[in-house]
Design a protein with these regions (language model features):
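Short, conserved catalytic or interaction motifs in soluble domains
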Residues: 46, 73, 98-100, 151, ...
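Structured catalytic core of nucleotide-sugar glycosyltransferases
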Residues: 1-132
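Acceptor/aglycone-binding surface of glycosyltransferases and processive sugar-polymer synthases
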Residues: 67-73, 77-87, 92, 104-185, ...
């Protein structure tokens, strides 16, 4: 590269992936070399607790085309991806996981689609036989719900394995929000997009950090990031409950005045109170999610802090402490120097 921007940057967020990095590089580097393009590989350590950073440092020492971006703590995968995008110097960036579930060989097709003029190319995964029925049902329901409640139409199997050209990268870097749902942002920015299917492999080592609780949190973040329909649903629910209560009250008054029927007390009262209380609590919870997002946005904290940045070919000071805030693209740019 000789100081010039590489054609491709491969951004790999890592969290406790020490056992997977060497096998990944053994497959990834030959694929990139076979493309005949200049490239850099950026390993983004998201506060790993194992030897991930140590292994990454050894790989970078052996191959100057490998760079390291170590965050000061664990900020989560969405922020780690954002940090990698901020520091990617290539004309296009390929995002992929470190666990080898994203086959490096698929990069050949992603690069070919980029040559055809597409600016965002998604590798969409097929359903894995090892996935449980409950997880498949939850994922399918989320994609359908997001499509119904927002203008973001995520295809089934779309993830973080994708190629983004420089225009898309700059668009993503300009976005200020803190609670980020990157899969939705890839589609929201627009540009010419294409999908390429692939068969995901099993993890070669270690266990996934994603459980149902974290997946639910990501889904909730995605819904609140791209839709205000839940707020409208809470209002509609309140109107319906009020309407039902008025109808029920009219029925009771009619029974008493016209038919002399005694109004049953505690059963109907308790059912009404419990139902109304449930609707109120759900509405407050939905409102709280949006208020919490507003609170986090108004704090204007940096998205992340960088504890150690050593770019490919060593063009920056290692060990420097820096930060980046999506509210200020200039601050994000400062971390790349």
């Amino acid at each position: 590269m000789n100081g010039k921007a590489p054609e491709l940057s491969v951004v790999i967020p890592c969290f406790n992936e020490a056992a997977n990095l060497a096998p990944l590089m053994a497959r990834l580097v030959p694929v990139l070399e076979g493309l005949g393009r200049s490239f850099e590989i950026l390993l983004v350590d998201d506060g790993s607790r194992d030897r991930t950073l140590e292994v990454a440092a050894g790989l970078a020492a052996a191959d100057p085309r490998i760079g390291i971006l170590a965050l000061s703590r664990n900020f989560g995968k969405e922020i780690a991806i954002t940090a990698g995008i901020d520091h990617a110097r290539g004309n296009a960036a390929i995002l992929m996981d470190a666990d080898l579930q994203h086959p490096p060989e698929k990069i050949i097709e992603l690069a070919a689609a980029w040559d055809e003029g597409f600016q965002i190319i998604h590798a969409t995964q097929a359903v894995r036989p090892s996935e449980g029925m409950v997880k498949r049902l939850c994922v399918k329901s989320f994609y359908k719900l997001l499509a119904q409640l927002s203008d973001i139409k995520l295809p089934r199997g779309a993830g973080d394995f994708c190629l983004l050209d420089r225009a898309a990268l700059d668009a993503l870097k300009s976005m200020p929000e803190r609670a980020r749902f990157m899969k939705g942002l890839y589609f929201w920015v627009g540009f010419r997009q294409k999908q390429i299917p692939y068969e995901p492999a099993e993890r070669t080592a270690g266990a996934s950090a994603w459980n149902m609780r974290r997946l639910f949190g990501l889904a909730l973040n995605g819904l609140t990031a791209f839709s205000t329909v839940p707020l409208r649903l809470a209002s509609i629910a309140g109107i319906l409950v009020s309407f039902i209560a008025i109808i029920y009250a009219l029925i009771l008054v009619t029974d008493v005045l016209l038919h002399g029927i005694d109004v049953p007390g505690y059963a109907s009262l308790m059912v009404g109170l419990l139902f109304l209380s449930g609707v109120q609590l759900i509405s407050l919870g939905i409102l709280g999610e949006y208020v919490g997002r507003i609170f986090n946005e108004t704090k204007q904290r940096p998205l992340y802090f960088v504890g150690n940045y050593r770019p490919a070919e060593g063009h920056a000071d290692a060990g420097s402490l820096s930060c980046a805030s999506q509210a200020s693209p200039e601050a994000a740019s400062a971390t790349r120097t």
